[in-house]
Amino acid sequence: MLLCVSCLSVNGEMNPLGPTPSVHRSVSFWLLRLSVFLLLSLRDSKGKAIWTAHLNITFQVGNRIISELGESGVFGNHSPLERVSGAVVLPEGWNQNACSPLTNFSRPDQTDTWLALIERGGCTFTHKINLAAEKGANGVIIYNYPGTGNKVFPMSHQGTENIVAVMIGNLKGMELLHLIQQGVYVTIIIEVGRMHMPWLSHYVMSLFTFLAATVTYLFLYCAWRPRVSNSSTRRQRQLKADVKKAIGQLQLRVLQDGDKELDPNEDSCVVCFDMYKAQDVIRILTCKHFFHKTCIDPWLLAHRTCPMCKCDILKP
């Protein structure tokens, strides 16, 4: 629709030159607005990097020592990106969310450093993490709600910047919970993993959208303009032929001595401004205005209208 509108002139006639500069400016302005919007949205999303956490889990079952290493957690938004290790300790009691201010942790005697394993929900992440820190935890591991599988996200916990806090999935958290409840001594080493930048994906998609819009416009313009040019050329040829035919049907007259048109008080030819003389050939238009044939014919080919009243010779 944008390109079709561009081929019309002010009076509704086809513009043989195709899209006008004003339309190009409007399309360029639209593309500029799109790029500014994408850049602004990119600025808003920038800086939200997500850091994964490698968890090296070690525990003993019978005579076997089992170790699991996986990128199974993410650091909280306000957590220091540091390595931390220790025995995994649960909150005392049946409720594992550590929301009560009276919550304690049963730390094994042989443990120098320990990590609190806490269930998500019931209170803010900040409350859980600060409570564990007050009880002496060196780090906090929070596992997600039941039914969420191993889905994780970077937690928001302002005011807890001095203690490492990571989130793990519910399935992994329940595995650790059951092991510890069965009396298994579990230790975990938390190490900084990789940085993921969602804004980079957003940038790529934004750039792709902008380029796609630009390429689409250029493709449509290039595919459409030759057709418009050919159509306009044919129409111009036909129009010129119609004008020539109409000119040939206009009345001609040779001025003779005594004709009133030769009176010095009469008007001169408004095209060349010369006075009419005997033997001059004049062309009389449908509006009854007349001019030198040699003057008016080129004028009509170019303008199609009477120089005085703008009467169109193609219209009855």
Swiss-Prot record:
Predominant place of localization: membrane
GO CC terms in record: membrane
Subcellular localization is given as:
Membrane
Q: Does the keyword Ribonucleoprotein apply?
A: no
Which parts of this protein are zinc fingers (RING-type)? Answer: 269-310
Report domain PA positions: 84-178
Q: Which cysteines are joined by disulfide bonds?
A: none
Q: Does the keyword Signal apply?
A: yes
Q: Where is the signal peptide?
A: 1-12
**GO MF terms held by the record:** zinc ion binding
The residues that carry sugar chains are N56
Membrane topology classification? Multi-pass membrane protein
* Outcome of gene disruption: Male mutants fecundity is normal.
Q: Which UniProt keywords apply?
A: Glycoprotein, Membrane, Metal-binding, Signal, Transmembrane, Transmembrane helix, Zinc, Zinc-finger
Q: Which residues cross the membrane?
A: 173-193, 204-224
Q: What is this protein called?
A: RING finger protein 148
Gene it is expressed from? Rnf148
